[in-house]
Amino acid sequence: MGSEMCIRDRNEAQKVFGSDFSKSLVPIADDLKLQVEFNRELVSEYRLLGYETRALARQDFNNDKVDAGDIGSGHSVTAIYEILPAGVANGFVDPLRYGQAVATPTRSKGFEEEYGFLKLRYKRPGEDESNLMSAPILKEAAHSSLSSAPRETRWAVAVGGYGMALRGDDYADNIDIAELSNLAKGAKGRDKYGYRSEFLDLIKTVNELKN
């Protein structure tokens, strides 16, 4: 397990060697893998934002010999999927000619309230055999609007959206930077160590350089 840090000022040094130092020293999970299966009756299209260099073949999820990411104490992992609900027009993918994407009633019976199914594998530090956790992604967990979503979700969307815009993502044409900035400000929260304020300053600096 290793970590790469970029230290550009005193505040960053305090973060790396102070508040975040123990997070890199104490591993809590090795070879963490995440897999999501979407219900094709409810989701017609989906895509994972980022993680292009961390993608695994489907069959490698259950293969404990395939390495994956390690997680330290205090770290968290966020995966953002963009989905298109079934029946919504203007998708990016043409309808299938053979083998329609909509599942048969027999296959979907009992899963009408599930957008998908999440599976997570990890190894305890020093062990060779992985452990499996799983849970359905329920319709009842959805929110009618982004503004009604939990603060952590709104923050993650703001950061992910800005990352897409900054790198010139093919799907970022309609992203409004000012709207993302306001979204991040509203989801800033307590911000004990000032990291979120630093992100807001970064948005401001990049926008000034662009203009």
Q: What are these model-derived regions, one by one?
A:
Residues 26-33, 44-46, 89-94:
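Acidic/polar loop patches that form or flank catalytic/metal-binding clefts of enzymes
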Residues 1-7:
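Short, small-residue-biased leader/transition segments that mark boundaries at the very start
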Residues 8-37:
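C-terminal helix of von Willebrand factor
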Residues 43, 51-78, 83-211:
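Long, acidic serine/threonine- and proline-rich intrinsically disordered regions
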Residues 26-28, 40, 110-112:
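A generic structural signal for short, solvent-exposed coil/turn residues
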Residues 36-50:
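Soluble, acidic/polar mature domains that operate outside membranes
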